[in-house]
């Protein structure tokens, strides 16, 4: 019996089956045999009657936006294929990012505090052979998904929203003035469809037409007891060189019922990449070295596993009128992050206001909706970082090159202070911080820059330069655009106001200007 089988034998039987189902999906992706569904069709006929303003497909994170829109008076339906209930595993985020729930009126301050299950400080960053860097107040809050989603669900229902559970999305027909959503045995007519079904949404699969992801983040982990007492966390740690053409990274933090640990790695979709079960075996094999605990002392509460595909063509632009991808469906997170809750929260206020204005102006065509998922150069520049943290199957680099590069970069950021380090750790890249980091690394560790160029390749570097220059442009335009455009917004027509506000949002979020607000 493998370590993985021994570990999963202590959990309900369906856990190992779920791991192997996810592995089968990962294998199909590597082999390029995932079927491309056809779930969206178009009709030139207008709808005679429209019952809803918004239908949200996918309730786990869709309920966040659903509650915000329902409280603004819109007729909103949320469709969930199962039961709308949060998972038992906490969502980790920084406290500042949670303020949006209070500012949007979704939670009171007391409710927000009750939603916080755990809090720890500080967190460690360290790479094999390098020095430790410690930070405070970054991804150190564990939110209770069960309480949060139940509270938001009740707020949603109290505001007049309707929730349909056990109602899986089956298809949509886009008409000139709305859309029909088929879910379960029911049909819903609506002005706008929001796709919150995640990375493997059938709508997204149809839109991408089987395109292979440009990168994938593989993640395995668990919440367990039996570890030595430790009230600190790890944000990004490695303690091994490259193995199996993968650089393994680790994350750990205290949880309500134990300690959560993850192993993750950045890869491409080469058919010889490891399975999640093989990665889980390495996770358990290396755990004694990582946490100072013998395998037989670990008492698992939950197993965690998954993979997150990333596309350079992100955020995903709408392919049809009346349908907008949001959250993981849109790919609106950097290729370095797991996306999910944190990415949804970051864009919650922007999407709430933007969708509200789109409905007011009745601009739900493809061109208008694409303004809600704009190009973000601060996300695009992170693709180069993703390449420096991964190695191709046919590539030969020094075993510790990735560790040495990252150690040099993060040591440099640490000396530049929290204003440089913290935003990057929270998936927000800003031009001044990036410029300072790259300049310091080039001046103090030129050998690191020289070693990275052949690793990432000239084409990737050239593409990155374009995004880097655009990021600098956005950083300059954002503070200029606010005083020039914002005072005139109230004098514009609803349509002109919608497009103007989207430009302001693009500069703000694309430059990382939303950080700290």
List PLM regions with ranges.
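C-terminal helical "tail/cap" subdomain of flavin- and related membrane-associated enzymes
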Residues: 2, 20-32, 353-517
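Beta1/beta-strand and adjacent pyrophosphate-binding region of the FAD-binding site
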Residues: 44-59
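Glycine-rich FAD pyrophosphate-binding loop
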Residues: 55, 59, 65-90
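N-terminal FAD cofactor-binding segment of flavoenzymes
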Residues: 83-124
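Dinucleotide-binding Rossmann-like beta1-alpha1 core, especially the glycine-rich loop
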Residues: 95-104, 122, 130-148
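Short beta-strand to alpha-helix junction loop
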Residues: 133-155, 202, 270-275
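Predominantly flavin-linked oxidoreductase catalytic cores and closely associated redox partners
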Residues: 158-289, 348
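FAD/FMN-dependent oxidoreductases across multiple families
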Residues: 256, 272-389
